[in-house]
Design a protein with these regions (language model features):
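Alpha-helical transmembrane segments and their juxtamembrane interface "caps"
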Residues: 1-193
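Short loop/turn motifs at secondary-structure junctions and domain boundaries
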Residues: 11-12, 216-219, 341-344
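A conserved glycine-rich beta-strand in the N-terminal activation segment of trypsin-fold
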Residues: 25, 194-199, 207-231, 257-259, ...
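Generic structural signal for well-ordered beta-strand positions
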Residues: 29, 235, 360-361
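Sec-exported extracytoplasmic/periplasmic mature domains
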Residues: 56, 93, 112, 129, ...
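Active-site region of chymotrypsin-like
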Residues: 205-212, 272-283, 309-402
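Conserved active-site neighborhood of the chymotrypsin/trypsin-like protease fold
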Residues: 215-223, 230-309, 393-398
Length: 403
């Protein structure tokens, strides 16, 4: 962690510059300039997701170049709007001739200009904070200035431009933490590689399934992992089956495909339960014991739509994580395990196994900052979904694609 955030230094320098410019142009020009600047930027933010979806594959992960282009487009559109309204403001300001009024006008102009700059920085930063871009994303997430702005704004502000944020943050995983929240990563020793070769991991294969389905709402084939937790019942992540009407499961990722239906869809926790009546596979049991820091664990699943893959893991710690739900409709608090583990797309929905083959929790995300850190919902967090999912057999709406 750097002692001084470079982005914060740039924002403070920009604030001084905008204050000087605002003082010179005055409140009347400044407020109209702000309206034009924010208006142009908001138009770009609203249109970019629509344009992006038309010219790219929905599953495409956003590159650094695309993010930079998106930010430049927003700034250019904001500047065009600002130029137009500033011209109108200059014409109006010529009519202010009383000296005290001009002092108030100048001071107000400095304040308005700085506020506008910080709001636009927060808007762009909120979107960049959800990306896994090296350096840039981390600088944004660690910004004290942007954190301060976010604390002043209403709690629901993070959901105002969710389409734009989701477009830039396509990583295949939900966000665990709110923008500008420091991700707490506890140092522990590396996982024991022998766990990946243990008989427990091989035996669990009979209860772990590959989940595949087509989501018409975004024309994507979604793939992930699930596991049998009760007769004919499979637990996975909600984002694995978001918008999927007829998911199929495959025991161990091989052989026969079994048709299932979504009977529980908890988009806030990111948990779904599938009813697969013809599935004959032993159920994994959730443990009643909590994992402690440095506890051994196993991550098993089908990353990147591949074959059965087992990785040793070690629990870093247990966290109450505040972050957006999978649709960015609001902020939720999740009880999660932070893991020293390799988690890839396709691991979503898989079990976090104990060394004796029980289930600590459900793998659902990976770190934006550290490639060796993943996250799992704890057994306590999903306890209500376990109880309801066991007795549910009616199809529910799986809404639309989440990520």
């Amino acid at each position: 962690v750097t002692l001084v955030n470079v982005l914060d230094i740039l924002l403070l320098v920009a604030a001084v510059w905008f204050a000087i410019v605002g003082y010179r142009q005055g409140f009347v020009v400044g407020i109209l300039s702000v309206i034009g600047f924010l208006g142009g930027g908001l138009i770009a933010v609203s249109l970019l997701p629509l344009i992006w979806d038309r010219v790219t594959d929905n599953g495409t992960q956003v590159s650094t170049t695309v993010v930079v282009i998106a930010v430049v487009v927003i700034i250019v559109c904001a500047s065009i709007g600002q130029a137009f309204t500033t011209h109108l403001g200059n014409r109006l300001r010529r009519h202010i001739t009383w000296s005290p009024a001009r002092v108030v006008d100048a001071t107000g102009g400095a304040l308005v200009n700085v506020v506008a700059m910080l709001l636009v920085a927060w808007l762009i930063g909120s979107a960049l904070a959800g990306t896994s871009l090296p350096t840039l994303g981390k600088e944004v997430r660690n910004s004290k200035v942007l954190l301060g702005v976010s604390r002043v704004l209403p709690a629901q502000a993070n959901t105002w431009f969710s389409d734009f944020s989701s477009t830039l943050a396509r990583s295949g995983f939900p966000q665990v933490f709110s923008p500008f929240s420091n991700e707490p990563i506890t140092e522990v020793k590396a996982p024991d590689p022998a766990l990946a070769r243990s008989p427990v991991a091989e035996a669990a294969k009979r209860s772990i399934v590959k989940v595949v389905g087509t989501a018409p709402s975004c024309s994507k084939v979604l793939e992930g992992t699930g596991f049998v937790f009760a007769p004919g019942k499979v637990m996975t992540n909600a984002h694995v089956v978001g918008g999927v009407g007829e998911p199929t499961v495959q025991i161990g990722g091989e052989g026969k495909l079994y048709d299932g239906k979504v009977v529980l869809y908890d988009w806030e926790r990111d948990i779904a339960v599938l009813d697969v009546p013809k599935l004959k596979a032993p159920a994994l049991e959730f443990t009643d014991k909590d994992a402690a820091s440095s506890s051994d664990a196993i991550v098993a699943g089908f990353p990147e739509n591949g074959s059965y893959d087992v990785r040793a893991a070690r629990v870093r710690g247990r966290i109450n994580a505040n972050g957006p739900d999978i649709y960015h409709r609001g902020t939720v608090r999740r009880d999660v395990y932070s893991l020293y583990a390799t988690v890839r797309q396709g691991n979503s929905g898989g079990p976090l196994l104990t060394p004796d083959g029980k289930v600590y929790g459900v793998v659902f995300a990976k770190s934006l900052d550290d490639p060796n850190t993943g996250y799992a919902l704890t057994a306590d967090e999903v306890r209500d979904d376990i109880r309801i999912g066991k007795v549910s057999d009616r199809r529910v709406d799986s809404q639309g694609c989440a990520l």
